[in-house]
């Protein structure tokens, strides 16, 4: 997840954050969904995208970022989403929405 920079649209942010946090690069994004994180309290909106045709590279994390990336098969990701291994709400929403879309 990342913050929209001034003048940046959500797709640009997604491409930038993908590279910074994982090292992967893409120019092909498909919007998946967007939603409010805490309606009634905040107007913060989460935008989800599906990135394809990825090119691997080194992550470019900011100082202090503690991120561990995992590559797992799709069935394992779904198991992790459903058994409570994945606890991050935006990750769960993204995985479950994409799972429905790909059926």
Role assignments for model-derived ranges:
Residues 23-24, 86:
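Helix N-cap/coil-helix junction residues
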Residues 1-16, 54:
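Conserved Nudix-box catalytic region and its N-terminal flanking loop in Nudix hydrolases
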């Amino acid at each position: 997840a990342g913050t929209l920079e001034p003048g940046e649209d959500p797709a640009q942010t997604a491409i930038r954050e993908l590279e910074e946090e994982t090292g992967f690069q893409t120019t092909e994004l498909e919007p998946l969904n967007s939603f409010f994180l805490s309606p009634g309290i905040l107007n913060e909106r989460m935008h989800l995208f599906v990135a394809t045709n990825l090119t691997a590279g080194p992550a470019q994390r900011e100082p202090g970022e503690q991120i561990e990336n995992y590559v797992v098969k799709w069935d394992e990701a779904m198991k992790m989403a459903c058994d409570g291994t994945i606890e991050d709400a935006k990750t769960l929403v993204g995985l479950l929405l994409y799972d429905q879309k790909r059926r």
